[in-house]
């Protein structure tokens, strides 16, 4: 299971009839709101509840796929003595991850580099990627987690621009990396702007630890680094069910709480959830 750093609130709206889905950590709740002046019939409420359940199932399935893809790649690195760039690229292509998972924009490997070994690491990495450097080294840092290998779904040059960048330098990402290490499993960040994206699109990054294999079951080896994958929130919420729900409802996504400042996706650019008196009737509640 992915453990989200922040809460997400998701609203589905259609004219006077609206449905609200809360994702709390990975808890999802669907609420249906009834216009008091028009009193929708029970069959309409039931039909909307069924739609909310179907949406919940599809979202759960997609989140599981994101987590599984991230975990599988980290297991591949953990089980290998040394993964070469061509092996990483072949794995991504053979798995068809970008084709199967809409919104997934990139995968990468972030090795753990102790601060005292940066110069040696840069020399070794430079044999694979000439000119490799970890820019903007920080005082008092025990270790860096720079991008070494990576693939981007739409723009291969993006990886070259980011190669060597220390992902732990961004607080929201470092917090998720630390939690992934503690949980020994995939952890997602809060939504934030993608690095060096001209459109400043919002992404969620998922981190899974890469460890040295241990002989005994249940023992955790030393941390060798992290696998990350990034997911654009826009196609995730708009297209993950092939746009079927968008034909019937407006989807609104809030982070942490329902407020204008926390809105991260709105299908029709009209924030129905912020209107006074929106919440009325609870129709469905579930966890994913």
Model-derived segments and their meaning:
Residues 3-38:
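Extreme N-terminal signal-anchor transmembrane helix of membrane signaling/transducer proteins, especially
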Residues 4, 18-19, 34, 63, ...:
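Intrinsically disordered, low-complexity segments enriched in polar/charged residues with Gly/Pro
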Residues 16, 30-38, 66-71, 163-170:
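A broad, low-specificity signal for short, low-complexity segments enriched in glycine/proline
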Residues 25-30, 34, 48, 63, ...:
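Generic detector of bulky aromatic hydrophobic side chains
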Residues 35-68, 74, 78-82:
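Juxtamembrane membrane-water interface segments immediately C-terminal to a transmembrane helix
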Residues 45-53, 78-288:
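Intrinsically disordered, low-complexity polar/acidic regions
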């Amino acid at each position: 299971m992915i453990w989200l750093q922040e809460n997400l609130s998701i609203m589905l709206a259609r004219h006077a009839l609206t449905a609200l889905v809360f994702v709390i950590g990975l808890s999802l709740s669907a609420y249906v709101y009834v216009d008091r002046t028009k009193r929708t019939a029970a069959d309409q409420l039931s039909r909307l509840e069924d739609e909310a359940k179907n949406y919940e199932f599809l979202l759960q399935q997609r989140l599981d796929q994101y987590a599984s893809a991230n975990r599988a790649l980290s297991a591949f690195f953990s089980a290998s003595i040394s993964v070469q760039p061509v092996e990483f690229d072949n794995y991504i292509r053979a798995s068809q991850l970008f084709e199967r998972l809409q919104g997934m924009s990139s995968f990468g490997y972030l090795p753990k580099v102790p601060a005292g070994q940066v110069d040696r690491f840069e020399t070794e990495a430079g044999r694979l990627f000439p000119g490799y450097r970890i820019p903007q080294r920080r005082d008092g840092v025990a270790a860096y987690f720079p991008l070494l290998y990576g693939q981007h779904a739409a723009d291969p040059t993006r990886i070259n621009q980011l190669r060597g960048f220390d992902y732990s330098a961004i607080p929201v990402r470092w917090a998720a990396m630390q939690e992934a290490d503690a949980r020994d499993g995939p952890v997602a960040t809060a939504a934030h702007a993608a690095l060096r994206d001209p459109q400043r699109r919002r992404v969620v990054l998922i981190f899974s630890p890469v460890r040295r294999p241990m002989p005994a079951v249940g023992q955790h080896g030393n941390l060798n680094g992290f696998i990350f994958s990034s997911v654009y929130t826009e196609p995730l919420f708009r297209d993950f069910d092939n746009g079927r729900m968008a034909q019937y409802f407006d989807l609104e996504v809030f982070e942490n709480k329902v407020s204008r400042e926390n809105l991260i996706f709105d299908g029709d650019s009209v924030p129905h959830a912020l209107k006074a008196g929106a919440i009325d009737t609870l129709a469905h509640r579930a966890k994913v």
